[in-house]
Amino acid sequence: MKAVLTCFRPVVASHRRYCANPGQAMKYLNVAEKNDAAKTIAGLLSNGAAQRREGYSVYNKVFDFEAPVRGQNAKMVMTSVSGHMMQLAFQVSYKNWRTVDPRSLFDAPVKKGVGSDYEPIKRTLEREVRGCQGLIIWTDCDREGENIGYEIIDVCRAIKPNISVYRATFSEITTVAVRRALQQLGQPDKRQSDAVDVRTELDLRTGAAITRFQTMRLQRLFPEKIADKLISYGSCQIPTLGFVAERYKEIEAFVSEPFWKIKVLHTIDDLTVEFNWARNRLFDKEACENYLLLCLAEPDPRALVESVTVKPKHKWRPTPLDTVEMEKLGSRKLKLSAKETMTIAEKLYTKGFISYPRTETNQFSKEFALAPLVEMQTGHRDWGAFAQRVIEWGPNPRNGNKSDQAHPPIHPTKLAENLQGNEARVYELVVRHFLACVSKDAVGSETLVHIDIAGEKFTANGLVIHERNYLDVYVYDKWSAKQIHHYENGQRFEPTEVSLHEGATTAPPLLTEADLIALMEKHGIGTDATHAEHINTIKERGYIGVLDKGFLVPGVIGMGLYEGYDAMELALAKPQLRAEFELDLKLICQGQKDPKVVLTEQIAKYKQAYQQITDKITAMDAKISARINETPAANSAVQEGADGSAPSHGIIQSIFQCPKCNEAPLALKPKKNQQGWYIGCNNFPDCKNAVWLPTECKDASVLDECCPTCGDGYRMLKFRLSTPYYRGVFGTPSGWYKTCLPCDNLFRTTFNINLDSVKKVGGIVGEVRGGGGGPGPGPGGGGSGRGAGSGGWSSGPGGGGSGGGGGSGGWGSGTGGGGSGGWGSGTGGGGLGGGKGKKPGGESKKSATKKPPNEPKPKKTKEPKAAPNKKTSSKSSGSIRSFFTSAAPTNSASNGLDEFFDSNDGFEDAMLAAAESVESSSQPKTISMVPLDDDIAAAFAADDDAEFEALVNGGTMPTESNGDQQLDKSLSEWIKEQDKADERPMLWGTRERASLGTAAPTPPPKPAAKRPRWDSVERDSTPPSSVPESETVLCTGCQQPARQNTVRKNGPNLGRLYYKCPKPDECNFFQWADEPPSSAKSKNSTGSAPQSTTSWGSNRVVTLPSIQQSNSQRGQSSMRSNSSSTVTITQTKTKQQERNTATPGDGEEVMCNCGQLASQLTVRKDGPNQGRPFYACPTREKSCGFFKWGDEDQNQGASSTSWGSANRNPPGRSQPTAITSDGPKTRRCGLCRKEGHTRNKCPRKDEFDM
């Protein structure tokens, strides 16, 4: 143990040296809100030793110094921003006023990004943060400052995601305050930042929507007076305008009334005392005259003094200064606007002369040190003496009742004697107010004298000031003494004058900025920090004006807007709506409300208000017209939309939510050349999802009608088809076609529109999203989710895919569930897509929507389920013919194209019937699935080993359903007689099938084996090969079991299996897994029938992917399978033309196997066989399986069939293309394996990237 500890000690020591790194000091990036603040803070922390250098912004310098942080010396880099660095804005798609419906701005995506003017600041932060280990935020300690701090954090963490972030909390920029903040670093408050984000987004959405609507409308209606004006709306601006407009309307509506009152005067030695009538005034002159006659009834009227009262009187000193009071004092005493006052105060704060000017607190805490601040002012020539008196009294502030728990009241932080202009005036106001609030009240005495004349009461008062106290320094308050004669109780005197005086009522005065700020604070409009901004904004808009004496009057347009909102009975002009929102913001800061919930609720309220505006907009038109004296334009009613909005021509029309970004809707937009249409995401450029409509679609528009299948939010698309061919395809003789892209499979297939561009489909892009089947000779598992599930990669029954589509019958043979039949033989389900499985005997269910009785219950998925369009459901049910062929003229004379495409001609049944006798192991029983999380694991959950053994050994299967009793007879007999499928590759065709019957004698039956189970852990196995599973491939050099590998390199052999030497010092052994060894080849060449050749692919056996491939490989294979339902083979133009013109027999009738005249059809699907004629059974319901190419020699028979056989490429594998001698090889895409483009320009590149 001692030896162990001895060895462990140096490791611990080295670890401590690595972690602590005491030789290197920490380096912090400090960021302030303004350059002046950064300069001052750097100077205070460094004792004036900070070194200045330039940043990318010429207005924001960088300062380097050292300072102790939490007891350890650290390197400091101080810089600054210039207020908000990021701006919230709509995406580019919403910038054009004329093409965007204002209503859509309530839900349009917004993005917060750094403005172009602030890029140099951003670059400075990015450069400096790279060499720092910590970030300290020194912005103002309020909501806005916290939000600016998080903007800084976002920029810095984009460069260094794990950087430590700290918050410096301070209320003044003094040496004591900033050093204390540096030693008591905290964390930023995300709640305050969230409150600002909510307010910013709501103001942006509501302001932009209503502003655009009323601006475009009023400009159109009144082109002479408002053509070039912006008629803006703001949730704080309009209520603020309402206060001014209401006062102005009160004055307009005021009617003056005359009144009369009795006045009594008593003069002694040039001192006149006026006694006020207890009745004040009367509006009835006759009654007032009667009272006067009553007082004068006696020839010598005498006044009797009833009481003389003397009581002390105090004039209260002011409470500490907060932001609102400073703005009001600046307006009333300094005649400065609120905006000017706040701008000057912020400058004084950044220079360190006063504390933070944005505060709601008007009380000093008991712990606040007032004496040093007062003593600091004793050296001033104007108020230094009074400050000394306050020191002698002891500072005693008169506190108010408000506190924001963040900042103290506004107070001076240091003496300033060299300020000039308005800065000196504002600084003087702050200092005098501070000294006054911590001094004493003024003290005096008030005398009240009550007299009686003939029963009428009169009163006079006087004031004597004993101690002025705070009035000596606070020159903004006046308290004048009022002298009065000496009176005693019971004294009688003769009044000098008793007379009747006439007056009239006057209207209330216009509002001043101080009055307006008081009203905004009372009703909760804005905050102490935003009052000045709101007032200044409506001034700049021209909604209000300022008269010479500072009185505010509404402008012409401002009054029209207020009256218009009032006529519409709209709450937007009232303060209640905004006051509720301001209260919610406070609750967000306190953590009592969710920001997202508040934003959603407020947007819903403003949506209702917007709807009310559009419904009653004519009321505003009338009010605006009356105020500006202009008649609305005559043609405006014709041009405007139904809701009073601008003309809809050119408006971008939203269709449904983008499935890729889920942040903005897809919208119908004209192409740049105005020659067509496309559907693009409004979240561009962040989302580049787009669907380019073909040129055949003319006059496209978006209907208000929603899709009945997809539901609300999915609007229908309407356009006119320009060509007769597509009119016939879609069954619209008039050419007008209405569709919903997510559920119209026919439209997407016809014009090659990717499903994932219009619908959220999940990880594997495409319609077929089933899971894979089982490995080896087991039954295939059903795929979960919408789309078809693939069956087993090898033999075994294919399980039906749960959800909207069926499962393919398996890459080998098998009894398929619903969906497409297998690429091999067996009783696989017929048709691509959602067709039901084929009954024994070649019967196929026509219905595409009804599930098989034994289909497993679908597994729930998150993807939205969209049923197919009713108009195209039958066409998407799985008929191969509906995709590749159209009826010949002889058969389509009585039936239109619509009827033909809606029919099931049994072509897929013919293909499956022709492949029934392929030699592959199959099991005539569909194993029920249990829904599991893993689709493949669900397919192999059932323990069916006993059934599998009984099937392979020819035993009897237990009867469980009617479907089990209707097994294909030929398949059952073949299973009992032979087991050659394990020795030979699976082929699909006619001549190959015939050759298999005579190639070799039937080997003895093999002992039954347990079905291999799928390993849920190890999935990196390989596809099945031509080598039987019971045999082991030995290396020819070392005679050891060879190692099986898969080709990973892109090319014609991608995914192909091969064997090589397993030893590290490999020998030269190599063998393809899907090709027999050289001995087998030579034996086959001498003893077996020759293999037939077809025009599809090469002659070699095609290998198939294993069920145990990785998920990514299986996803790519599925995508390749979805992209092409047939194999693309390079053909020369000459041979293609020869096939199109050659017909067998030149007029001879072709009969099918059931004795009827065969139907002559033509391949319509794009591909090497497009336009090629062929014959098939005319019976669509019960096809005999007859098929024959029309351009091939009759003597060739079925051996020349290009459908099926092992030459056909299975989905998911990229096979070498057969190149004819008549033409060169055409280059293909490395992703989708189609010609005409490369992988860089592949239209499906995004699918394969996933």
Swiss-Prot record:
Sorted UniProt keywords: DNA-binding, Isomerase, Metal-binding, Repeat, Topoisomerase, Zinc, Zinc-finger
Basic and acidic residues bias locations: 840-865, 966-994, 1012-1021
Name of the featured protein: DNA topoisomerase 3-alpha
Coiled coil regions in record: none
EC number: 5.6.2.1
Domain Toprim: start-end pairs: 27-171
Gly residues bias spans: 769-835
Catalysis performed (reactions): ATP-independent breakage of single-stranded DNA, followed by passage and rejoining
Topo IA-type catalytic domain mapped to chain residues: 189-610
Gene symbol of the encoding locus: Top3alpha
Active-site feature positions: Y356
Enzyme class: isomerase
A Gene Ontology molecular function term of the record: DNA binding
Binding site for Zn(2+) 2: C1152, C1154, C1177, C1184
Gene Ontology CC terms: mitochondrial nucleoid; nucleus; RecQ family helicase-topoisomerase III complex
Family listed: Belongs to the type IA topoisomerase family.
ZnF start-end (GRF-type): 1035-1076, 1152-1193
Spans annotated as Disordered: 769-899, 953-1035, 1069-1150, 1188-1231
Biological process annotations from GO: developmental growth; DNA recombination; DNA repair; DNA topological change; double-strand break repair via homologous recombination; mitochondrial genome maintenance; tissue regeneration
